[in-house]
From Swiss-Prot:
The name this protein goes by in its record: Heterogeneous nuclear ribonucleoprotein M
Sites of Phosphothreonine modification: T625
Signal peptide: none
Domain RRM residues, every copy: 70-148, 164-241, 613-689
Any Pfam family: HnRNP_M_NLS
Source species, domain of life: Eukaryota
Compartmental location: Nucleus matrix
Organism: Rattus norvegicus (Rat)
PTM sites of type Phosphoserine: 29, 85, 164, 325, 337, 357, 392, 412, 428, 441, 488, 535, 548, 578, 593, 597, 661
Post-translation changes: Sumoylated.
Encoding gene (name): Hnrnpm
Summary of the function given for this chain in its UniProt record: Pre-mRNA binding protein, binds avidly to poly(G) and poly(U) RNA homopolymers. Involved in splicing. Acts as a receptor for carcinoembryonic antigen in Kupffer cells, may initiate a series of signaling events leading to tyrosine phosphorylation of proteins and induction of IL-1 alpha, IL-6, IL-10 and tumor necrosis factor alpha cytokines.
Keywords: Acetylation, Isopeptide bond, Methylation, mRNA processing, mRNA splicing, Nucleus, Phosphoprotein, Repeat, Ribonucleoprotein, RNA-binding, Spliceosome, Ubl conjugation
Length: 690
């Protein structure tokens, strides 16, 4: 690898010599006779054109000679001086400036040094003469020519920073810059990829890849060093010689590797990210919601243990046994699960006839007879005891829901809920439909048993009604927040539910034939009339009223589903802990992890950057308006917002552009960074402060 670097240096050193030789008055011809300079020039120009075509193609190159960068390194800058003020000073004293970058520390504070790039070599030399020892806010500036970036590199090494460019050797000769960029894009955002070529425009088997961040360059070394590309092992290391534009990190960049640390291995989190153990058990408010947030598995945790369906919403009926010892639901779960499984197996084997082909379901009747007696009565008592606790908790829940301003952000995550689970639901319900056609005869026997049990539930339900009266005021206070949830859930329907619901249509028709066999006679035998008006009137439903229920709307299902598991435990007497963390919600932890992680695999833990949709553009022409900025960046994608930063009614030469998605913002950075507008090369990057 050292030989490859030295060879690259030799090419860079020999190219100027070739130009000097070509500029000599006479050049020897093939037969040894001197040829006048004028006759040789067309041949040299043709060769250069062919060479440029082979090397660059249509790629944009901001510098006429990419091997030369006219930089000046300035130190002893007052710490309160901004890059714009420094640029104005250099422009006033020297002339046109291409690029200015203040070097910052990990906290975003100036280190008192900067890199200034010029378009012409004369400007670089003039800056070293004119600005050196120039007094700025009482401090004499120190200016040095730095065309190879050596002074800036030393300053960055002192700051413990790494470059973002890697050097790749032992490449196959047919690998071009596009293939190199395609491969290394797996490690991060590639700003530029280059293949070093010889004087004939052929690959030398070495190249460089520049990433957006240094950590991506380190990751590329970990991922690709020693890996085969076209049967040749790549040798990847940090490029110590290159310092391309963009290696000077602005304050919004995250902290880089500590000084002296050469690299890091893979963490235990997703994508090799390190895990913060402090956030693993940080569930919020509604039970087992996963680390520091509420993902799809979290919000469906109570629902998916009841459905008997596969996929993210599935998981069988095993969790019904956790509804409290006083409810005897574990026995119901065992009988129903076993019977449904046997019925599904028989249906797949092609058995016909409801009574003869599903003997397990027919045997459910006597079992439910035994369950529905004492078991149902104990269920009512358990409900009465648990609902006393739930009532007070829901009143506290109302206070919490008033603070849930971030619920409006749930829409983007809920849009991802559709495709995540409904396709799995459709296939599972399709199998349930075949089984439901054979359940009818067994359900007839269930009716008699359940009727006896429900008759004995009337008295406990009276006690439940007294508790539900207390829920009315709490539910009314939940109304405004859940109304915002309803608006967000409207966005869920067209996004992901369409395909799943289309598949569910014919399946539901098949389920209907089985449900019809339950009939009115069976329902009449269930003893529901014993619940009567007296019990229902005591439930305080009039307190909930039309206004609250209309605002709650279709959002009640998903909103309450997330808490079903914890509510089940609360009914057994442990519900008091469900909302003991209201202080954390009030301080903002609830909004960030709840709304920000809907539909994902957990929320954004503190310290993990959220992808931004806004970019920051610098070095704009001062006559550039927000309309011109918006029109220009519309080439990359739909622009939601564009603005030029102003001071005293005049442009500061920088602005922001907001896109509809982080992907479009990243594409705009790749496309527009380094582009020239009115002779000024703009600098485009993600606005981390947005």
């Amino acid at each position: 690898m050292a030989a490859g670097v030295e060879a690259a240096a030799e090419v860079a050193a020999t190219e100027p010599k070739m130009e000097e030789e070509s500029g000599a008055p006479c050049v020897p011809s093939g037969n040894g006779a001197p040829v006048p300079k004028g006759e040789e020039r067309p041949t040299q120009n043709e060769k250069r054109k062919e060479k440029n075509i082979k090397r660059g193609g249509n790629r944009f190159e901001p510098y006429a000679n990419p091997t030369k960068r006219y930089r000046a390194f300035i130190t002893n800058i007052p710490f309160d001086v901004k890059w714009q003020s420094l640029k104005d000073l250099v422009k006033e004293k020297v002339g046109e400036v291409t690029y200015v970058e203040l070097l910052m520390d990990a906290e975003g504070k100036s280190r008192g040094c900067a890199v200034v790039e010029f378009k012409m070599e004369e400007s670089m030399k003039k800056a070293a003469e004119v600005l050196n020892k120039h007094s700025l806010s009482g401090r004499p500036l120190k200016v040095k020519e730095d065309p190879d970036g050596e002074h800036a590199r030393r300053a960055m090494q002192k700051a413990g920073r790494l470059g973002s460019t890697v050097f790749v050797a032992n490449l196959d000769y047919k690998v071009g810059w596009k293939k190199l960029k395609e491969v290394f894009s797996m490690a991060g955002v590639v700003v530029r990829a280059d293949i070093l070529e010889d004087k004939d425009g052929k690959s030398r088997g070495i190249g460089t890849v520049t990433f957006e961040q240094s950590i991506e360059a380190v990751q590329a070394i970990s991922m690709f060093n020693g890996q085969l590309l076209f049967d040749r092992p790549m040798h990847v290391k940090m490029d110590e010689r290159a310092l391309p534009k963009g290696d000077f990190f602005p304050p919004e960049r995250p902290q880089q590797l500590p000084h002296g640390l050469g690299g890091i291995g893979m963490g235990l989190g997703p994508g090799g990210q390190p895990i913060d153990a402090n956030h693993l058990n940080k569930g919020i408010g509604m039970g087992n919601l996963g680390p520091a947030g509420m993902g799809m598995e979290g919000i469906g945790f109570g629902i998916n243990k009841i459905g008997g369906m596969e996929g993210p919403f599935g998981g069988g009926m095993e969790n019904m046994g956790r509804f409290g010892s006083g409810m005897n639901m574990g026995r119901i779960n065992e009988i129903l699960s076993n019977a449904l499984k046997r019925g599904e197996i028989i249906a797949k084997q092609g058995g016909s006839g409801a009574g003869g082909s599903v003997p397990g379901i027919e045997r459910m009747g006597p079992g439910i007879d035994r369950i529905s007696g004492a078991g149902m009565e104990r269920m009512g008592a358990g409900l009465g005891h648990g609902m006393d606790r739930v009532g007070s908790e829901i009143e506290r829940m109302g206070l919490v829901m008033d603070r849930m301003g971030s619920v409006e952000r749930m829409g983007s995550g809920i849009e991802r809920m559709g495709p995540l689970g409904l396709d799995h639901m459709a296939s599972s319900i399709e199998r349930m439909g075949q089984t439901m056609e054979r359940i009818g005869s067994g359900v007839e026997r269930m009716g008699a048993g359940m009727g006896f049990g429900l008759e004995r539930m009337a008295a406990p339900i009276d006690r439940v009604g007294q508790t539900i009266e207390r829920m009315g005021s709490g539910v009314e206070r939940m109304g405004p927040a859940i109304e915002r949830m309803g608006l967000s859930m409207d966005r869920m329907v067209p996004t992901g539910m369409g395909a799943g619901l289309e598949r569910m249509g014919p399946v539901m028709d098949r389920m209907a034939t089985g449900l019809e066999r339950m009939g009115a006679n069976n329902l009449e035998r269930m003893g529901l009339e014993r619940m009567g008006a007296n019990s229902l009137e005591r439930m305080g439903l009039e307190r909930m009223g039309a206004n609250s229920l209309e605002r709650m709307g279709p959002a009640m299902g998903p909103a309450l589903g997330a808490g079903i598991e914890r509510m089940g435990l609360a009914m057994g007497g442990a519900g008091g802990a469900s909302f003991d963390r209201t202080i954390e919600m009030e301080r903002g932890n609830f909004g960030g992890s709840f709304a920000g992680s809907f539909g994902g695999a957990g929320g954004h833990a503190p310290g993990v950057a959220r992808k931004a949709c806004q970019i920051f553009v610098r070095n704009l022409p001062f006559d550039f308006t927000w309309k011109m900025l918006k029109d220009k960046f519309n080439e990359c994608g739909h622009v939601l917002y564009a603005d030029i930063k102003m001071e005293n009614g005049k442009s500061k030469g920088c602005g922001v552009v907001k896109f509809e998605s982080p992907e479009v913002a990243e594409r705009a950075c790749r496309m527009m960074n380094g582009m020239k507008l009115s002779g000024r090369e703009i600098d485009v990057r993600i606005d981390r402060n947005a």
